[in-house]
Structures are given as C-alpha cells and as structure tokens.
Regions:
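Active-site-adjacent scaffolding segments
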Residues: 2-118, 122-129
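Structured surface interface patches that mediate subunit assembly and partner/cofactor docking
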Residues: 2-19, 44, 73-80, 114-228
Length: 228
C-alpha cells in the first residue's frame, strides 16, 4: 500500500505566484492606510525593530523591493549595514515618496520573485511581517493577520521545512487542517502549537506575544525564530 499524500505535504510544492500574491494583498490594505496617516505618525517607534521608526521600516521595505525589481544584489546586500545605507539614502525623501516607492515595489516585485526559483520567497514574507510591525506601531487591529495570513502561513511552513527548522505541528484557529512546519525526517518528535495564526507568526519572527493565549509544547519559543 503506497503512502498517502497529506495536505501538509502538498504545501511543499512551490506556488511561484504566492509571494507576489501576498505582496499584492498587503499592498491593497497597507498603502491606503499609510496615505491616510498624519505626517507625525511616520516618526512613531516600531517595537519589533529597536531604533527604527515607521518611516525607517517603510524605507527599508521599499528599498529591498526596488533592489529585487532592479536586480541589484551586491555583496552584503540586506546586511544591517546595507539596510542602514538604504534607509539613509532616502533621508531627503518625503514620506509620500517612500510610500509611492513601496507601492511600486509591492506591485512589480511579484513576477521577479516568481521567476527566482524560491530564493527570494522569504523576502516577500519578511515584507508582510514588516507591514504587521507598522500596523502594530499604529495600534491598528489585525497586525500579522488579515487577508494575507493563509498565504503567509503556507510560505512560512514551506520555508521552515526547506531550512530544516525544528519540527512543529500547529493547530490553528484560522485553518481547518493542522499546519506542519520544520523538518519532517523524524529525527526529533515535533512540538505542538495551539492558538491563532498571528501569534504563530509572531513566535516565528521574534515578535512579542504579550497577552496572547496559546499553548506551546515540546519546543521553546526561542527555537522557532527564523530570524534568530
């Protein structure tokens, strides 16, 4: 009797359109929100990125996407030093110009990421997470959630499996089927998470989970962080 294909296994087949779809969904929600905010809101601190303001995060995101669109990946790109230079290059820009560049990047980077064979998929997930950071800084509801969450969770699951991350089975309020993350070779029993999708995203990206209700068994939160 052959092995049965589970829904979790199906996720391992890369959907090249998924990263671009995630960016487009987030663009359609985030850009109008940014354009409606007062200028001083762009100076608010972002708790998930110490030392960065909302504007810093947006400048980092727009610069990264512009690099993708223009295929500019010099040595050291996306290092902390490179990120700081990208932000500094935009110091003289208006907030509106940064938002315009971000909108263009979120629109045009998708096809480039789709054609990159998977090596840029994590960047799309990172952009979506940073959008959650901005929503969080604004006190907006739905940070690390919303319409893009299913695509973000599927991307997160595949990326953690490709990286051989610690195995975890997540029973999510937001999905009908359990989500399997991390390596599945059986070397260690999987941990288990019970809770909602935004909290799982926070755990995997090192964001604070203060006040969130969830269960995490068999693995420590610090072991989940894909950016750690």
């Amino acid at each position: 009797m052959g092995s049965m294909t589970t829904p979790a296994d199906v996720h391992d087949v890369r959907d090249p359109e998924q990263p671009g779809r995630l960016l487009a969904i987030e663009r359609d929600g985030l850009i109008p929100l940014l354009r409606a905010r007062a200028e001083e809101d762009f100076a608010l601190p972002v708790g998930a990125c110490p030392g960065w303001s909302v504007r810093s995060v947006l400048a980092h995101c727009s610069a990264a996407l512009t690099r993708v669109v223009e295929n500019r990946f010099e040595d050291g790109v996306f290092s902390p030093e490179s990120n700081d230079r990208d932000i500094a290059e935009r110091d003289g820009w208006s907030n509106a110009r940064v938002v315009d560049e971000l909108e263009r990047g979120m629109t045009e980077a998708g096809p480039v990421i789709a054609g990159a064979g998977g090596k840029l998929d994590g960047l799309a997930l990172g952009e979506w997470v940073h959008a959650g950071d901005v929503r969080d800084a604004f006190g907006e509801p739905g940070a690390y959630g919303g319409a893009g969450l299913p695509d973000a969770l599927a991307l997160l699951a595949r990326i953690t499996r490709e990286r051989g991350h610690v195995p975890l089975h997540a029973d999510l309020d937001d999905l009908d089927e359990p989500l399997r993350l991390g390596e599945s070779g059986g070397e260690r029993p999987p941990g288990r998470f019970i809770g909602d999708g935004p909290t799982l995203v926070r755990l995997y990206t090192g964001r604070p989970v203060d006040g969130a209700e969830f269960e995490l068994v068999g693995v420590e939160a610090k072991d989940l962080n894909i950016f750690g």
